[in-house]
Regions:
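PLP-dependent class I/II
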Residues: 1-174
Length: 174
């Protein structure tokens, strides 16, 4: 699961996540929820954490991180959140056997700096700036290329342009 979805930026609705949790419980599936774009939501929208969904705690592994929020995707870092004790023990055992999961000192300092009031203020200001740019882009297309459809923009910072109205076939578009 990727919430908000990458690459389209859709924030999954709670009712859809509840249904996913029901199915995962019925079929014994572990859900790995990539929520790395969760800090990047616009228009007052928020991304529901999968662990907060009814019935999800027993089978959920949630990954968050700072790469998208702070623009340092080259820094290898993720927060893994597992509420269920047995699932966490299985994950930790595997992590230990595979020798991964430690932080280098630089990443450690980045994480400590980011999870502060100043870090949140920076993310909020960055999101406002990105949203303004998305609006500029949408306005430009509405004025100059009105048949192009701008898609995305709930979460993440990616917009897609549907150019189909300007071409009579896929071959022409290519």
């Amino acid at each position: 699961l990727c919430n908000p979805h990458n690459p389209i930026g859709q924030i999954w609705k709670e009712k859809d996540l509840v249904r996913l949790a029901e199915l995962a419980n019925r079929y014994g599936v572990i859900v790995y929820s990539d929520e790395i774009f969760a800090d990047n939501c616009y228009q007052g929208l928020t991304c529901p954490c999968y662990l907060d969904i009814k019935g999800a705690k027993s089978h959920a592994i949630v990954a968050t991180g700072l790469g998208k929020s702070f623009g340092f995707t080259g820094v290898n870092h993720a927060n893994i959140i597992i509420a269920d004790d047995e699932l966490r023990a299985r994950f930790t055992d595997r992590r230990t056997r595979d020798h991964y999961g430690s932080l280098d000192p630089c990443v450690y300092e980045c994480v400590l700096s980011a999870y502060t009031k100043d870090g949140k203020a920076w993310v909020d200001a960055s999101n406002a700036y990105v949203w303004e740019n998305m609006c500029v882009l949408r306005d430009y297309f509405a004025k100059h290329l009105p048949k192009a459809r701008v898609c995305g923009g709930e979460g993440a910072y990616i917009l897609w342009i549907d150019w189909a109205a300007y071409f009579s076939s896929g071959d022409e578009l290519n």
